[in-house]
């Protein structure tokens, strides 16, 4: 097996982009990754695209070939759907393809466009990643699921809402120097604790936001990198 190197990365700003389509967002990230990598488009042998909500938020199935086309590529393109891990799985499979020698160059990444939907529609859409028979029919939402997990953790290991609040504070602090982050505002533990409750003990500032954005990465084999 060969080693795998990162040749280029690209990101969009994450936030509300109601005027843009998912394929437009992914094209921005993919073109940025291509530019940083300096890999000729004809050398890219596959596009691995991760997406969960596209069929719901944009009524668009069979997305991967459209994403490849928008990125200026003509090669096999595959969509990976694994809920919140969709783009991560797309990248993992790209690494496996390069390591195994199946390909020398793969562009991988993902995109979600969600802010064109109402909060209720996004919540319902995200809930489809849960078990339809035993969770969705019982009214389970993902904030509710994580609230149950947090309560179980507190019961077994100890902990409190204040401990969770420090995680939110840390996350906002990490976003401050990141130009692509959705929020650029420091928050305090008190603000987290005083925010509206979503599903006890998960409050508004504990929960992940709805957002639009895309990212992409160009992976190459050691042999390709050394030859180019």
Give residue ranges: language-model regions.
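Conserved active-site "lid/cap" helical segment
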Residues: 1-85, 93, 153-160, 182-188, ...
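Conserved catalytic cysteine-centered active-site region
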Residues: 17, 54-105, 113-145, 183-209
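Short, mixed-charge, low-aromatic patches
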Residues: 19-26, 45-54, 105-110, 122-126, ...
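Condensing-enzyme catalytic core mediating Claisen C-C bond formation in acyl metabolism
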Residues: 1-23, 32, 132, 166, ...
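Active-site-proximal alpha-helical scaffold in enzymes
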Residues: 81-112, 143-177, 217-223
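Internal metal/ion-chelating core segments
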Residues: 151-211
